[in-house]
Amino acid sequence: MAAQNEQRPERIKTTPYLEGDVLSSDSGPLLSVFALQEIMQKVRQVQADYMTATREVDFTVPDVQKILDDIKALAAEQVSKIVKMPSISFRHIVMQARDRVLRVDTYYEEMSQVGDVITEDEPEKFYSTIIKKVRFIRGKGSFILHDIPTRDHRGMEVAEPEVLGVEFKNVLPVLTAEHRAMIQNALDGSIIENGNVATRDVDVFIGACSEPVYRIYNRLQGYIEAVQLQELRNSIGWLERLGQRKRITYSQEVLTEFRRQDTIWVLALQLPVNPQVVWDVPRSSIANLIMNIATCLPTGEYIAPNPRISSITLTQRITTTGPFAILTGSTPTAQQLNDVRKIYLALMFPGQIILDLKIDPGERMDPAVRMVAGVVGHLLFTAGGRFTNLTQNMARQLDIALNDYLLYMYNTRVQVNYGPTGEPLDFQIGRNQYDCNVFRADFGSGAGYNGWATIDVEYREPAPYVHAQRYIRYCGIDSRELINPTTYGIGMTYHCYNEMLRMLVAAGKDSEAAYFRSMLPFHMVRFARINQIINEDLHSVFSLPDDMFNALLPDLIAGAHQNADPVVLDVSWISLWFAFNRSFEPTHRNEMLEVAPLIESVYASELSVMKVDMRHLSLMQRRFPDVLIQARPSHFWKAVLNDSPEAVKAVMNLSHSHNFINIRDMMRWVMLPSLQPSLKLVLEEEAWAAANDFEDLMLTDQVYMHRDMLPEPRLDDVERFRQEGFYYTNMLEAPPEIDRVVQYTYEIARLQANMGQFRAALRRIMDDDDWVRFGGVLRTVRVKFVDARPPDDVLQGLPFSYDTNEKGGLAYATIKYATETTIFYLIYNVEFSNTPDSLVLINPTYTMTKVFINKRIVERVRVRQILAVLNRRFVAYKGKMRIMDITQSLKMGTKLAAPTV
């Protein structure tokens, strides 16, 4: 028992470092977290310098983990809802007539309450209102009918009245028995028919639905009935390819269920993701880099090599004076270990993250540190050929440091023949006169660094993500090889390492050459791990596209700035030695690895929805210039962002790039054709198709000013008046005669206002019983039902606002056309006790605003026409059928450990 209770000693870490004056041995922050902090700090520093003389910007570091959780939550959101009955599309208002009622299309009634009032000087509010109305259409029609209530009538299955989409129960109490029997017979005839859709049994019935809502429902039903079997097979097949590349086994447990005959399934998202959708976003390269790190980078430890390597090569003598021997026993500080992390980040993201040396004028650099860094830097980094880990400045500084080390003859003197140029490494050294010029950095050929005479970028079998087909091969190592750290690397080598050993031997640095010869297996394991991480774990839709990757190095050399500029991180000289003496060993794979494809699909789908919204909004100014006089493209950009999910906005703005996006970036993105197919995108496009008719959004430009007297009929026969179902509305059944309409543009109104004749001119037109149409501006329309005299603001309201004021002896006038317009319906109710002149006033009441909308919002119908709107075909799934959203099956998987970890 004592042995069992004995506590195990803690495993000693192999990477001790000094944190202040305390020797720490923890592994420090996760590399992914550290990367996000360092990249954001660098980006914020550059942006802050840029914005010093302009407006302030919030540069707080975003919580990437929270953003990823929010995007996963978006995948769980249901685009459609499952209901037992459709919403009520038509309701009826009871009148005093026994055989007449008012039928109201509830869609237009509800739509009139969506959004804010449109004005000419707030284009952003106009765009936001349009988006809200479009989303209202999409939400209203995105329903799936399941287990509808039915009843049995003479052996036939009949739909319950509430399923039909018509509300008429409030009418039944005032109807005669004959009319009630007629309606009951019609209801008994609403028989449920048995249908078959995609080998599944369904109920089919005829109901009522408004046209825009039914368009969305019909599109959703067509999406489901198309089965999407091929899309599902493509997604699963692609996941299998991705799993093979990333060593992930994707579960098909859920997929065995949907094949059952009692299951209806919906696939709301598709794989693979179209990478163009993600990379077309303006100024997104840094945000995509951060997402790649957050979703794919594994966690690991920094492993030191066997200490006997240095003890038997560098420090075997009692007195050691060489630079390598001096640094052998040193311990890094916390800041220096952070620089080591930066170095490994640059190695894992070649070209995207590059390194430069810290500029610290107050630091007195030990020459030994510089010399050692110059040697190991040539063995750690790649500078040219196909990509680079370094800036041109750092490569030159490393060349100078290597030059100094070779000329530092602390053991024996070696012959040196200098060249004519005076460039670093322009000499021949040793008995065999080794030409050191070959180690001078050449970004064209990669000479002097790891890319020298090595195929470090390869294209072989097709990769799952079509935009990133490259395979990185540091030191010529194939990432498909399995790594056994105890034996891997023995007998392996590559050109730059061989030449370094030859040059060290020629320079008389035999101990150092022996050290590097012994370090070679450790060095090869290091880069074999990095190759595996890059080619397996980091392969993602957020990986830099091949064309951008291939352009990074030429652009860096030429000083050209493109869409994907590299992130430059600063490191210290001594950190190169500590990085060479430590290898990043992955211990756990990223928790988001198997969920990453679903996160990518959700993100791309939301971006596609935003792009479709912006395309349609960008056309608004050309279609309705009068309401968007002061509009700019940035207005609809902001409106779309404000109505987009917070998680998607946060990803797009990870590097605070929204503060720097210009109109050129935005319009270029909007016009690019790439989209990610999804159910949400399909419904959004259909909603915009329905919204192309602005009257379906309860917006109209057919608003007229006309003086009309409110009817005041005599009640000579109360019973007959009741039977007529008398009502009045300012809604026109047809536009007025064209020759009686005066078109008032802004220019005409301003001219008459400047002359002080605006009101007089309108009065003259009204006295002639003519009509005035104020421009072609869109107006927000509200619907109101009243059974008494409407308020004065409704009756006397004008389709414009005209304000005058005097300032400094000058008269100013303000004219606005975009005002809220109210369509009112006045229903006359009378009693038998009313006298013939009960509705008559001494002075007449006038209405001044008339509206024409080519939609049947309200109409007076006879009782036998109550169910005449049942003309839409609905498909309902039976109650015993299951409706499954199998989108979540695209993320069910298990990460496989690497065979040698």
From Swiss-Prot:
Top-level taxon of origin: Viruses
Any one GO MF annotation of this record: structural molecule activity
UniProt keyword terms in alphabetical order: Virion
Cellular component aspect of the GO annotation: virion component
Location, primary (coarse class): virion
Location of this chain's protein in the cell: Virion
Similarity comment: family membership: Belongs to the orbivirus VP3 family.
Role according to the record: The VP3 protein is one of the five proteins (with VP1, VP4, VP6 and VP7) which form the inner capsid of the virus.
Name under which the protein is recorded: Core protein VP3
Lineage, opening ranks: Viruses, Riboviria, Orthornavirae, Duplornaviricota, Resentoviricetes
Gene it is expressed from: Segment-3
